[in-house]
């Protein structure tokens, strides 16, 4: 009798769809400069699931750890090459395209998937504070220790604090979930 109950329950569990991730915000279009020195238009990310972070190359605090973790995201999502990664600098005065290119190479980035962006300081600050809704100090963007998950319609679908246990596993799970939701 117990077998008769368990088999239908297992079949039902296999059909249950995961709960959709919430929509936490909407990003507007932006134009910045990539580590290649070429213009980067956010529209190139449209239709792609992507993960963002804010770092700077001379940081001796959490940035190297975050970039290493972003490399793990790159590795753990290698089977889905449509997933993009975007690292924004919070120190554009120092982090020129050549500096970002050297930093990217150090973290073994895949140039087809992982972009390092710089640009106008006011624009980057506005994007971090008002676009991504990351906390700043005194109205300016200080690097956050959170990753941000964005869907192909530029909607923010998750925040992941790097100091929380299991954040990377949850982030990669949610990336894969958004990939499965794509039309």
Language-model regions, residue ranges each:
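Sec-dependent signal peptide recognition
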Residues: 2-8
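Bacterial signal peptide processing site
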Residues: 16-18
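Structural microenvironment flanking redox-active thiols in thiol-disulfide oxidoreductases
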Residues: 67-127
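Short active-site neighborhood of thiol/selenol oxidoreductases, capturing the structured segment around
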Residues: 42-70
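A short beta-strand-turn-helix
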Residues: 30-50, 74
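Short loop/turn microsegments at loop-to-beta-strand junctions
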Residues: 27-28, 50, 144-146
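Thiol-/selenol-based redox modules, centered on thioredoxin-like
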Residues: 138-183
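C-terminal motif of bacterial Sec signal peptides marking the signal peptidase cleavage site
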Residues: 11-14
């Amino acid at each position: 009798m117990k077998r008769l109950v368990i088999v239908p329950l297992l079949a039902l569990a296999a059909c249950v769809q995961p709960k959709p991730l919430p929509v936490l915000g909407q990003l507007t279009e932006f134009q910045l400069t990539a580590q290649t020195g070429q213009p980067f238009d956010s529209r190139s990310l449209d239709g792609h699931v992507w993960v963002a972070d804010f770092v700077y190359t001379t940081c001796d605090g959490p940035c190297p750890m975050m970039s290493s973790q972003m490399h793990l995201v790159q590795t753990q999502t290698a089977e889905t090459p449509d997933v993009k990664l975007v690292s924004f600098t919070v120190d554009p005065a120092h982090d020129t395209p050549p500096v970002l290119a050297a930093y990217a190479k150090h973290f073994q980035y895949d140039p087809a998937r992982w972009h390092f962006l710089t640009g106008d300081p006011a624009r980057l600050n506005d994007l971090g504070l008002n676009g991504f809704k990351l906390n700043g100090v005194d109205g300016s963007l200080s690097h956050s220790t959170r990753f941000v998950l964005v869907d192909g319609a530029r909607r923010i679908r998750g925040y992941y604090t790097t100091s929380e246990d299991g954040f990377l596993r949850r982030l990669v799970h949610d990336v894969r979930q958004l990939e499965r939701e794509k039309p």
